A protein has these predicted regions:
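A late-sequence structural motif
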Residues: 45, 197-234
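Flexible hinge/capping segments at coil-to-helix
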Residues: 95-131, 135
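Short, small-residue-biased leader/transition segments that mark boundaries at the very start
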Residues: 1-3
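Secondary-structure junction motif
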Residues: 129-151, 220-221
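Alpha-helical linker/hinge and terminal dimerization helices associated
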Residues: 6-27, 227
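Central regulatory/effector-binding core of bacterial HTH transcription factors
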Residues: 30-92
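Short beta-strand->loop
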Residues: 96-106, 158, 192-206
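Hydrophobic hinge/microswitch elements
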Residues: 68-73, 77-80, 87, 152-198
């Protein structure tokens, strides 16, 4: 067994032990699941998909922690949550993971927002006010990586506003305070209502994975996988 495999096994054992101790301390008669989700998934994707699981497991208690990818990975590693749904990048070789969905990542503006110039590519937007999530957020990391590929960065923009909440960002964009980049799933309702508009860019096309992750070889894996199978169905 190589040292990295051994380290992963030890980490899983320690995390499982913490989870078991927590369950014993609660002394619950009903089963419980404690998991995490990043903001876009937790607010806009999972709520619509939880119905089936809740109906089939009416005795199960659920706790969903909504945090950014970096924080969820720390919580998973330490046994504070059993599994996570993340939109950010993570070391795939370190975890057991499965694809939840693929989502389009888009630029949007308010319907009455006047762009500084005619826009065709990402560089045409740098004179705008950019409203983004905080560092450590999966949503922001996707944007940073996409920009790097065309030699741009968040600091290329004229003005930057950082907000740690998707709803607040959408409100500011609806009120024409700037533009933002987010997952289509997070803005679908506002786009359909005509409150937000997609900014078409010929050089910026991102389709990104939302993934379900657990520690390798967890004793709870079968229970976690059953939950995933249920929410995998739209």
């Amino acid at each position: 067994v190589c040292s990295s495999d051994l380290a992963e096994k030890v980490r899983t054992m320690v995390a499982d032990e913490k989870m078991i101790r927590g369950l014993l301390k609660q002394n619950q008669k009903t089963p419980s699941l404690r998991f995490g989700a990043t903001l876009t998934i937790g607010e806009f994707l999972l709520p619509q998909r939880l119905n089936t699981y809740l109906q089939e497991h009416s005795q199960t208690s659920l706790t969903m922690i909504v945090e950014n990818t970096a924080t969820l990975l720390q919580m998973l590693n330490s046994g504070d949550i059993g599994f996570a749904f993340v939109e950010g990048y993570f070391p795939k070789q370190t975890y057991d993971w499965q694809l939840l969905s693929q989502e389009r990542y888009i630029a949007v503006k308010g319907k009455d927002y006047n762009l500084q110039k005619e826009v065709h590519c990402l560089k045409d937007l740098v004179q705008e006010t950019l409203i983004v999530r905080e560092e450590g957020s999966g949503t922001r990391e996707i944007l940073e990586r996409g920009m790097q590929e065309i030699n741009l960065s968040i600091s290329s923009f004229e003005r930057i506003i950082e907000i740690g909440n998707v709803q607040a960002i959408k409100t500011l964009v609806r009120n024409n305070q700037g533009i933002t980049f987010l997952y289509e799933a997070a803005a679908r309702e506002e786009i359909e209502k005509g409150e937000l508009e997609v900014i078409d860019l010929y050089d910026f096309h991102i389709l990104h994975e939302f993934n379900y992750i657990t520690l390798k070889d967890s004793v709870f894996k079968q229970q976690y996988d059953a939950f995933f199978a249920s929410v995998q169905r739209p």
